[in-house]
Amino acid sequence: MSGHKKILIVIASVIVLVTGLTLYFQYQSHQEYLQLKTSFEERDNIVVLQRLMASEKYAPDIRKAGYVVPPDGAIRLDGGIDSIEIKGDIDLKISHSGRNGVTAYFEIEIDGKITSALYELDKNFDITSSAYFQINEKNINERVNISQSEEERLLKIVQSEIDGFMKKMYQTLYG
């Protein structure tokens, strides 16, 4: 075989390999896109949040929708988006806490004191556990209780904010 034929075979092999890899990665990206859309449409909230927060891939879209996420460098360092800030009736931070839930953190004023609230929510964004903390006069963070009606009122606000986020993200991604 002549030298030109060997070179042409090598070049053709490289072109086929590069084209194959490019098509494979485009296919994978399209599959992820369709899986996320299906999860949105099936209201599989935990899977949607998991996919949105798994890497920096959707960070620009989340920012475009008007939400706050860490800088890209921090996302790469952490291996994903650790929290999303939703500014609305309450300033809410949500994070994906595992396979079965979402953590929601926010601060509100109760009886003239700033109260930190932490909710663990299930796939329907119902509370599985909640905790409320205030800083006392000795500057110590202590757990406090709130009434059931107040917790229900706050939960409705949190659910509304997260539902709004989900709808806005669907609109941003799929128009």
Show which residues each predicted segment covers.
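Extracytoplasmic electrostatic interaction patches
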Residues: A74, G80-G175
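N-terminal export/targeting and maturation segments
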Residues: G20-E107
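Short, Lys/Arg-rich N-terminal segment immediately upstream of the first membrane anchor
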Residues: M1-H4
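Basic, mixed-charge low-complexity alpha-helical segments
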Residues: I9, Y27-Q31, S160
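Hydrophobic membrane-insertion alpha-helices, especially the h-region
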Residues: I7-F25
